UniProtKB/Swiss-Prot annotation:
The protein's enzyme class: lyase
Signal peptide: none
Annotated localization: Cytoplasm
GO biological process: pyruvate biosynthetic process; ubiquinone biosynthetic process
Name listed for the protein in its UniProt record: Probable chorismate pyruvate-lyase
Organism: Aeromonas hydrophila subsp. hydrophila (strain ATCC 7966 / DSM 30187 / BCRC 13018 / CCUG 14551 / JCM 1027 / KCTC 2358 / NCIMB 9240 / NCTC 8049)
Chain positions recorded as substrate binding sites: M37, R78, L114, E165
Amino acid sequence: MKSELTVPLARLVPWQTPAQCEPPEALLPWLLEADSMTRRLRRHNRHFSVQLFGNRSVALDADEQQLVVAEQPMGLCREVILHGDHGPAVLGWTLFAEAALQESGLRELGEQPLGERIFGDEPARRDHLQLACFEIASNPWCPAGTVWGRRSRLFLGQWPLLVHELFLPSLSCNKELE
């Protein structure tokens, strides 16, 4: 978890494989989704948008540095909220090595969903799927509460990206979860 995130939160348990934890049953299809979260949200919502908070330099933890193959302990973080019919649904942040920004086209991404780029024409490569539970503080996008999230490594061409997705309370308004 990066303390520099716009939405204040604290991880309650270490990242674990799906077999090591017990998230709410209704969230399992979301947490274990193999395809793009953007596609899943678009399938279940008439309205979808991306709110970009920005890109910034951040200190990478040792495991993050290893997963994104960063030569230095600093990396870049792209932070967004994905909105659906009932408001903010997913808080996302992606960590990557600075070299990836220069050579992968991430700089020009803007408010285009990262999932559209990664899951474009070719099958995406994903590994290191892990889940964790977070305490999220009250903020302009959601009330305080406990939320579940996932992180996994995806590849944009040759560049590894560590993608984090936290499922916000308004996602439970989605008809699939009822």
